[in-house]
């Protein structure tokens, strides 16, 4: 039998809209046999997802989407099939959590100055884990500042906009080395979504390969 895979999905543990349990149920409805939960810089949703996956006969692979900086750009590296309790992985994700929280607070301050009241508190109320820009976007929609998430990024949260805050994420080699140390494989996430020219994408792929990366999403 041909298996159906989904190796990159998010839950409410980061910026997804479904809980880990509901996400696995949705995957089952869609006929997915092998699923990887790859929340941003966290693995807190995996245990919950695993319980439901076992009930429904879905193979759940440990996953995470690690935020990195490369040449001044934010690049996401997916880790798959790793030991989520490995000391290097837990240390890296703890560092990322601290960086993400610091950025979230700074974004909240900028939104306050831009006339958005209680921005951090509002976004946090919508989050099940770390506060992300997606939660701020949803809050902006909720209070009527914008009509949809996309408009929130275009007006406030996207790169170069008034409330954008650049995070000092780890570099790509650190992400790759950590994933490998934990027994997993490292993959460039959505390479065509970084608004880069073909020349820059090729540079990214070459660097990633030289640093020991294993593959990329297509």
Locations of regions flagged by a protein language model:
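Short, glycine/charge-rich beta-strand/loop segments that flank catalytic centers
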Residues: 63-66, 121-127
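Conserved acidic, metal-coordinating active-site core of Asp-based
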Residues: 127-191
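An N-terminally biased module of ancient metal coordination in phosphate/nucleic-acid-related enzymes
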Residues: 1-73, 157-158, 171, 177-218
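Short, well-structured alpha-helical patches and their helix-loop capping segments
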Residues: 92-103, 124-132
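Generic hydrophobic/packing signal
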Residues: 64, 81-83, 115
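Active-site gating loops and adjacent loop-to-helix segments of metal-dependent hydrolytic enzymes
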Residues: 69-101, 119, 138-161
């Amino acid at each position: 039998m041909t298996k159906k895979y989904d190796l990159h999905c998010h839950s409410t543990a980061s910026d997804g809209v479904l809980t880990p349990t509901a996400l696995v149920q949705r995957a089952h409805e869609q006929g997915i046999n092998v699923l990887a939960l790859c929340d941003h810089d966290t693995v807190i949703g995996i245990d919950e997802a695993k319980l439901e996956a076992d009930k429904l006969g879905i193979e759940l692979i440990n996953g995470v989407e690690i935020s990195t900086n490369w040449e001044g750009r934010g690049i996401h590296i997916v880790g798959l099939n790793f030991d989520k309790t490995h000391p290097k992985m837990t240390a890296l994700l703890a560092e990322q959590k601290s960086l993400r929280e610091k950025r979230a607070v700074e974004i909240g301050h900028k939104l306050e100055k831009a006339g958005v009241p209680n921005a951090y508190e509002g976004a946090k109320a919508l989050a099940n884990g770390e506060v992300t820009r997606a939660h701020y976007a949803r809050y902006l929609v909720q209070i009527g500042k914008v009509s949809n998430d996309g408009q929130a990024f275009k007006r406030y949260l996207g790169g170069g906009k008034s409330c954008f805050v650049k995070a000092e994420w780890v570099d790509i080699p650190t992400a790759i080395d950590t994933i490998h140390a934990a027994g997993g494989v490292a993959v460039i996430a959505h390479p065509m979504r970084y608004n880069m020219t073909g020349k820059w994408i090729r540079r990214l792929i070459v660097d990633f390969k030289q640093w020991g990366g294993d593959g990329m999403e297509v």
